[in-house]
Amino acid sequence: MCGIVGAIAGRDVVPVLIEGLKRLEYRGYDSSGIAVLDGTQVRRVRRTGRVAEMAQAAQAEQFGATLGIGHTRWATHGGVTEANAHPHISAGVALVHNGIIENHEEQREKLRALGYTFESQTDTEVIAHLIHHHLADAGDLLSALQRTVKELTGAYALAVMSQAEQERFVCARMGCPLLIGVGEGENFVASDVSAIVQATRQVIFLEEGDTAELRRDGVRVFDASDAAVERPLHLSDVSLASLELGPFRHFMQKEIHEQPRALADTIEAAIDAKGFPASLFGPTADAVLRDIEGVQILACGTSYYAGLTARYWIEAIAGLPCSVEIASEYRYRAAYANPKHLIVTISQSGETLDTMEALKYAKSLGHLHTLSICNVPESAIPRASELVCYTRAGAEIGVASTKAFTTQLAVLFQLTMVLGKLQGRISDSEEADYLEQLRFLPGSVQHALNLEPQIMAWAERFSPKENALFLGRGLHYPIALEGALKLKEISYIHAEAYPAGELKHGPLALVDATMPVVVIAPNDRLLEKVKSNMQEVRARGGELFVFADQDSHFSESDGVHVIRTPRHAGVLSPVIHTIPVQLLAYHTALARGTDVDKPRNLAKSVTVE
């Protein structure tokens, strides 16, 4: 949510800022703006709507500057107006901010008493005025920023410049992601590396409470006590090619089709090892996982559904109790802590605020062992975890998660294998069988992708609908949940998912001739139960759209449409059945003309409550 980019260089930074903001669009936003130091004057342009509209306005201004900051805003405090858009300015101090300041009202009253007036409804303008206020005593911008952040309660990432200081700008981080890009004779700040990858791949990840000063010739970082510190320099593996569409219409479509490669990369270490060593999860994983007596998974959204799927695997295969909770609920309840249970957090970005706070809460309760599953190296959640396993999905730009979800499933399956071996529940021959299933997974996903033309025909039937129902059982109920979420996220069709056995306990009242019902029907031990549930739908006039394995022996009839997925893939079947529900959501949204990659009101990285 929201995005920051800043630059100081020996060249015009306006194109860098604009390009960076365009690459941050996927995070979700409703307005944007830049501020630059043009001579000795701070000049600013802001617009609601797309970055492209703001860029046109900036071009008309004919800015020329070697120092500037930019922002994409997701409205929290105050509506979607130009006055509320960033950057905010206080007498020559310009600032952009991600996050939420919880004590902004208290600070606002103090500032009003000092004679400051406010032009916006935002909490951000409070910070700009505070920095300006402290400049008088502190004497320089960095010291003023360091004094200011000590008065703030909440989460923030900040980039600040002043017309009085033409050779540097400053930044700060607490609870929201922020990194520094290190170039040659130029340096940058950004919410994520995609914003600056066109300029540099060398990055410094700021820690909680850090402040920093950026000049053309160098960077200085200070910790929460204002002591100078050295933070390691990393080489990002994000490439420009991964941020381009190539032959695809949308990033979501591209990322759906990248799943065979992403899965192959994610399982490569296990394939190379010819098994499932604990070292897949870090050098100390064997000692940590050997004594685990249970698993608790904390996640949000799509990652939560990955966790629900893993619960079936962990309990059935590894023989360990497993609970799965929505992170935003867990962090506010009086939870019971068992130090022998492993806390697993799942987050594509590694910066999801509720998941991060849930992890902190679990530790405070006495949980000793933590594992994070994440797609972004060196992000906050992995850094706060004892063990880490990175999915190798690559950059995911579309707001609706696709390849991150299936690679999370692949990692969770490998975790199940490791735990099962350590529990003595998986023999050598069973391990070899599971490894063979995993080896065939990318190919099976490719076969599922080949169903796209058939699914496109279904999408035309779905596009005029306003409601849809998804049904699944057992391992495939979370996939029904994921299918419903994808459809509602990007097509704006109201969709719900239920365990098929719950139909008669309420949802059946919704079924009529106008209600499409999507059924996940693999050829497993619950198939006959699913068929009975389907008969309940047909008896009420509901129209069935069935994703069935090739060996499920379904036939089409009036009101029953069937697409045959690859042969039943055993315990990895949920990964295969994810592909058609992703494609159905994508092509339905396409038929309805929605903004597939940037659906309304949603953000890719949710870094506020």
Curated annotation (Swiss-Prot):
GO terms for biological process: carbohydrate metabolic process; fructose 6-phosphate metabolic process; protein N-linked glycosylation; UDP-N-acetylglucosamine metabolic process. InterPro entries: GATase_2_dom (IPR017932), GFAT (IPR005855), GFAT_N (IPR047084), GlmS/AgaS_SIS (IPR035466), GlmS/FrlB_SIS (IPR035490), Ntn_hydrolases_N (IPR029055), SIS_dom (IPR001347), SIS_dom_sf (IPR046348). Keywords: Aminotransferase, Cytoplasm, Glutamine amidotransferase, Repeat, Transferase. The keyword Transcription regulation does not apply. The active site is at C2 (nucleophile), K604 (for fru-6p isomerization activity). It is an enzyme of class 2 (transferase). Residues 284-425, 458-599 form the SIS domain. Its main location: cytoplasm. It catalyses: D-fructose 6-phosphate + L-glutamine = D-glucosamine 6-phosphate + L-glutamate. Its EC number is 2.6.1.16. It comes from the Bacteria. Pfam families: GATase_6, SIS. Residues 2-217 form the Glutamine amidotransferase type-2 domain. It is found in: Cytoplasm. GO terms for cellular component: cytosol. GO terms for molecular function: carbohydrate derivative binding; glutamine-fructose-6-phosphate transaminase (isomerizing) activity. Homodimer. PANTHER family: GLUCOSAMINE--FRUCTOSE-6-PHOSPHATE AMINOTRANSFERASE, ISOMERIZING (PTHR10937), GLUTAMINE--FRUCTOSE-6-PHOSPHATE TRANSAMINASE (ISOMERIZING) (PTHR10937:SF0). Catalyzes the first step in hexosamine metabolism, converting fructose-6P into glucosamine-6P using glutamine as a nitrogen source. This is Glutamine--fructose-6-phosphate aminotransferase [isomerizing]. The gene is glmS.
